[in-house]
Structures are given as C-alpha cells and as structure tokens.
Amino acid sequence: MGYLLWLVTAYVIGSVPFGLVIARTFCSVDPRTGGSRNVGATNVARLCGTGFGVLTLVCDVLKGVVPVAVAMTFSDSAVFFSLTALAALLGHLYSVFLGFRGGKAVATTLGVFIPLAFTPLLVSALLCALVIWRSGFVSLGSLTLVTALPLMLLITGNFTYIPLALVVMTLVFWSHRENIGRLARGEEKPWQKKKHKEHE
C-alpha cells in the first residue's frame, strides 16, 4: 500500500507544471499559447529569457530526482525505482493539472536517471549538448540523449535500467513526434539561429 501511495505521489510531483507557474508569475505569459506552446524549459526561455528557462529546467529535473531519491530511502527494489521514475515522467507528460497534457519529459528524464545511473546519463547528456551546440536543434539533442542512454547503460554494464531507458526513449520520441516531422521536412526552428535573429 505504501509503495502504491508513493507511485501516486511521484505522478503528482511530476505533474506540477513549473514552466507554467514560472512564466505566469514572473513574465505574465502563458507558455501554452506562445512560442512552441509547450510548458518546458526551452519555450519558457524563448518567452521569458534564459534565466527563467534555466529555473524551469532545474525544477523539472528535480521532479525526477526527488521521487526516485526518496524511493531509494525506503526500498531496495530496482523495479520499484523504475516504476517511480515512470510515474514521475508520466506526470510530466500527462499532467493532472493541465488536463492530462504536459511537457516532453526530457528534463525529468535527466532527473530520474541522476540517482539511478549517473555516469551513463552524464555521457548521454554531453552528447546531447554537443548535438545542440553543433545543430542548434534542442529537439535533436533531446532525441540523441534518450537514444544514447540505453546504449551507455549497455556499454557500462548497467543492465538493470535498460528496460526503463527503452520505455523512456519511446515516450520521449512520441512526445517529439511533431518535432521529428518538422526536422524531416526541414521546418524545425534552430534554437541558436532563432536567438541570433532576435538580437540582430
């Protein structure tokens, strides 16, 4: 019963739309109606500035870290940790506070894997950053992250969380399906180029 209650709690924590709260509180804008119409850090940064985007990123990462880290204090079950991680991710993707809509779960993916598999995550995150830096596409970097993660888990011998990483990869690819379509058509907006144009 206690485990089930924590899974529900993890979902609720994951559901908190920090991007919406931050954008409304500090910028008086609704990220659901501006920019990419997403409540994630990238869109908040577009609409409110980099600082508020970073704040949103940190909060969304913590939505993943906290539920898993707390679960690890009262359980030693990798299956339970994986279920807790998925509950937090599903909360972010399908927030009870947003009519079961939400973000794209990349920041929260970072969060859930920090306590579970830090080294594979770090390598994957560096690859993600490199792709974003070289291409300007945050979406492409995000897809690189979740694709690299199960491979890094395999390479480092951390087989326990490969199933979780594969499920997460599927969820993140699904949440980016519109971005993938725009990338394929050459219509995706590069983050860096967009920012450069805004300052010209």
From Swiss-Prot:
Q: Major place of localization?
A: membrane
Q: Give the bilayer topology.
A: Multi-pass membrane protein
Q: Which reaction does it catalyse?
A: an acyl phosphate + sn-glycerol 3-phosphate = a 1-acyl-sn-glycero-3-phosphate + phosphate
Tell me one GO molecular function of this protein.
Answer: acyl-phosphate glycerol-3-phosphate acyltransferase activity
- Does Cell membrane count among this protein's keywords? yes
Q: Where in the cell is it found?
A: Cell inner membrane
One GO term under biological process is: phospholipid biosynthetic process
Q: Spell out the InterPro entries in the cross-references.
A: G3P_acylTferase_PlsY
> Which pathway is this protein engaged in?
Lipid metabolism; phospholipid metabolism
EC number from the UniProt entry: 2.3.1.275
Q: Which domain of life is it from?
A: Bacteria
Listed transmembrane segments: 3-23, 52-72, 78-98, 112-132, 153-173
Record's keyword terms, sorted:
Cell inner membrane, Cell membrane, Lipid biosynthesis, Lipid metabolism, Membrane, Phospholipid biosynthesis, Phospholipid metabolism, Transferase, Transmembrane, Transmembrane helix
**Gene Ontology CC annotations of this record:** plasma membrane
What Pfam family is a match for this entry? G3P_acyltransf
* Known partners and oligomeric status: Probably interacts with PlsX.
**Which family is annotated?**
Belongs to the PlsY family.
Q: What role does this protein play?
A: Catalyzes the transfer of an acyl group from acyl-phosphate (acyl-PO(4)) to glycerol-3-phosphate (G3P) to form lysophosphatidic acid (LPA). This enzyme utilizes acyl-phosphate as fatty acyl donor, but not acyl-CoA or acyl-ACP.
Its protein name is Glycerol-3-phosphate acyltransferase
